Amino acid sequence: MKFEELAKAFALKELPESEVEITGDVPADMINEYKDAALTHIAGELDLPGFRVGHVPTDVALKKVGELTVLEEAVELFVKDFYPELVELKKIEAVGRPDIRITKLAPGQAVSLVIVAAVYPVVTLPKNWKEIEKGIALEEAQPATDEEVKQTIDSLLKSRAVPPTLTEDEVKEGKKAEAILPELTDEFAKSLGAFESVDKLKEQIKKGIGEEKQRTAKDARRAKIIEALVAETVVAVPAVFVESELDKIMSQMQEDVTRFGMSFDDYLKQSSKTEEGVRNDFREQAAKRAKLQLTLNKIASDEKIEADKEDVDAEMKHAIEHFPEANMALLRIHIETVLRNEKTLQILEGNKDPKHVASNHEGHAH
């Protein structure tokens, strides 16, 4: 390791909220090794009269910005190389970008650095986490009623109604006509798909409503199990995890708004809110989601739960068809996380050996 001795000299201090502070001094000669690259980088971005951008000579750039600015850039380049070795040597499981402060900077002198980094937090699960589901019963889903079946059929009839027709004179006279509903016959049932008769159609509708009620009951039980688990799990959630969840929420929200034919800026104007205001509205929800994900990660790690490769491959194939421009490596990680979450949640629900789970293609298993 190039910086092993220097890294050993840096002091490590644990901070609240899953952060650490690393402090130390960097010899001037180490920083000086980066000054030429720093000056070249600065010169390449300067926009000065008489020169094309990217073609400013380094001596002209130095006179323009001054030695201290070059030194600051050199420190930044040095830290990019030094930081990965530092966290590896200190055995820090850092997440996100560190906050780097220069507390002493002068030509020819050692540079003093203070680095604050978020670290992957310690997650303490409740001792009885495997037993939580036993205290939360699955509420019995009621079968579909005749009225619910009738409402569904009425909706089907209305969706296939024949639009009313009026002559121009009738329109001028203010006449109104109602859409003509088709009759509920075996022929109508057959037109909807593989239904031989009205009775078969009603039978399938009744079955579908019943299955939906069962899914709703299962979802409600899962939500209660999650709520109980997260409430008893102890973890200091780093801000970077909350911000990451907020980014996901905002991205989904922007997609939803766009789908309805409105720009996000117009949505903000109509809502009399700023983007930061909307983020703050969802901050509590994002914190809960972040805590849940950390909790699921801990269980998956302890129990050695992994997504099955064939399930991941199948989901990748589906996702690529819909998002061909996506980063394939990141997409695979995302799918693996979603499927691992689903397996973990099924185990939480009492399923000892979940097989071949599938995502809902919406990106969140929770």
Region spans (language model):
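FKBP-type peptidyl-prolyl cis-trans isomerases
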Residues: 1-366
